[in-house]
Amino acid sequence: MTTWSLRRRPARTLGLLLLVVLGFLVLRRLDWSTLVPLRLRHRQLGLQAKGWNFMLEDSTFWIFGGSIHYFRVPREYWRDRLLKMKACGLNTLTTYVPWNLHEPERGKFDFSGNLDLEAFVLMAAEIGLWVILRPGPYICSEMDLGGLPSWLLQDPGMRLRTTYKGFTEAVDLYFDHLMSRVVPLQYKRGGPIIAVQVENEYGSYNKDPAYMPYVKKALEDRGIVELLLTSDNKDGLSKGIVQGVLATINLQSTHELQLLTTFLFNVQGTQPKMVMEYWTGWFDSWGGPHNILDSSEVLKTVSAIVDAGSSINLYMFHGGTNFGFMNGAMHFHDYKSDVTSYDYDAVLTEAGDYTAKYMKLRDFFGSISGIPLPPPPDLLPKMPYEPLTPVLYLSLWDALKYLGEPIKSEKPINMENLPVNGGNGQSFGYILYETSITSSGILSGHVHDRGQVFVNTVSIGFLDYKTTKIAVPLIQGYTVLRILVENRGRVNYGENIDDQRKGLIGNLYLNDSPLKNFRIYSLDMKKSFFQRFGLDKWSSLPETPTLPAFFLGSLSISSTPCDTFLKLEGWEKGVVFINGQNLGRYWNIGPQKTLYLPGPWLSSGINQVIVFEETMAGPALQFTETPHLGRNQYIK
């Protein structure tokens, strides 16, 4: 039997010698040259948990993993990011699978383009990486509703993440389709998937003791035969245990290492230790700072985890971007939605550039590798294109007539229950409510998440979680009351995920009397939404545009397109679309000040740029080589 172990630089040998005394490891450099997907031909056993060690076939194995989410990275850059992972000395890719993106409507599945899971997994195998798949159904991942599809919320009695029949029936149908794609990619079928995670951090939710056994059985019944794992933070670990499933832990600091050495052992006895999520940074929320974690602290903690005889996964190795409206939110004391960038202060930047963390971790993993690491790929070029001044304009009020007949309802309808998208409701974007009023007074109601209130076309303020009332002034003549409501992102973590319906929730009141007879417009801003606005629908940009509005301009590129960062100085809040691709939201409250624009989404020649601005338009759009993610705050 081949036995692998670690030999490291003298400064770190003391801790390893202690492990030798304890019998955990036998010192020798790791030689990974034959233990890669394309070279391991004779497969029988797969990844196993035996005593303190993982075993892959007859070899002791350490998982040195990193997380990259295919859905947050342009497909054209998957190879670049995976090669950089391999060059850092890692041997395993981990990724979530987002149900909401793969099944946007009941029974209609999308695994094309940037959602081609199979192509991503097979590319990892080609590059020499094993794969741990995290298919949920709930994934958290700072995604809208934790990756669950919003159409589940059409059921007024829905209990997400439980064995409630309405939920499990939907999971079963989704898993029927998903696992038919995943099963052939497993290790025992010649693929790179060596382990599959059961749900995600359920111990912190823990509302139904029958739920985790149900998910485990749902995976196994559909042909999942590889090692099963759970993943929990320190608060949920003891409650997230499932019989026959290996428990792993999520943490960030050296102060939490006792969870590895003591708590994990107390929970499941003699089993391999695994940090499924070592958080290399953290996500950001609108209105907050840009969270960063010092590279020396990262190296110190990673070294301590490995010295403790544990496998590790770096979450995130490369964060990428919350393109479109996929970002999630948190709502404990206050509602806070996540920014567009998922840079995460990870090992690679949002644009895939190297960081001090990358260099230090590459040295570290290189020091315990028995073979030289492959050279890191060259950096991708960036380009500060010339500023772009929009020349055409379409106010939201003028755009409404091109959207077809509005939905008419006596009472407000929340976003998820709108009769659109084949009966699946609206998942993302904005929703506009209109009704007629004949008096002034106090307007009140529950708006999720942010509603701009208009009398005719004049903005009078906002309603949100903190501001639930607003004074409506007296206006002579026919008066239309309008509320433009934005879904800023459904909560992805916490106990209140069942309550994530968006738009107007319940009645809207004027002087405590419910308003009636609404006209409702679905503004999902998909590609099909903009196809209704031919060039003949736009007009020249006036000196003082009526807002909210769409602004149209063109970016001319004469050479091969490169990555760039879009800067919107003078603009306040909205969304940017390039050649039909939704780059995501911008907001001048920060911390994020630039939007990442991948080169593959541009073309040589003319590129169409559309900005939807809610409140204040700037003079131009600027492009820079350098991202600006906001004022730094060190994670403690």
From Swiss-Prot:
Recorded superkingdom: Eukaryota
Keywords noted in UniProt: Glycosidase, Hydrolase, Secreted, Signal
Enzyme Commission no: 3.2.1.-
A GO molecular-function annotation: beta-galactosidase activity
GO terms (BP aspect): galactose catabolic process
InterPro entries on file: B-gal_1-like, BetaGal1-like_ABD1, BetaGal_gal-bd, Galactose-bd-like_sf, Gly_Hdrlase_35_cat, Glyco_hydro_35_CS, Glycoside_Hdrlase_35, Glycoside_hydrolase_SF
GO cellular component: extracellular region; vacuole
Main location: secreted
Record flagged with keyword Hydrolase: yes
Residue numbers annotated as active site: 201, 277
Signal peptide: 1-32
Compartment(s) of residence: Secreted
Cross-referenced PROSITE patterns: GLYCOSYL_HYDROL_F35
Coiled-coil parts of chain: none
Homology family: Belongs to the glycosyl hydrolase 35 family.
Database matches in PANTHER family: BETA-GALACTOSIDASE RELATED
Name recorded for this polypeptide: Beta-galactosidase-1-like protein 2
Encoding gene per record: GLB1L2
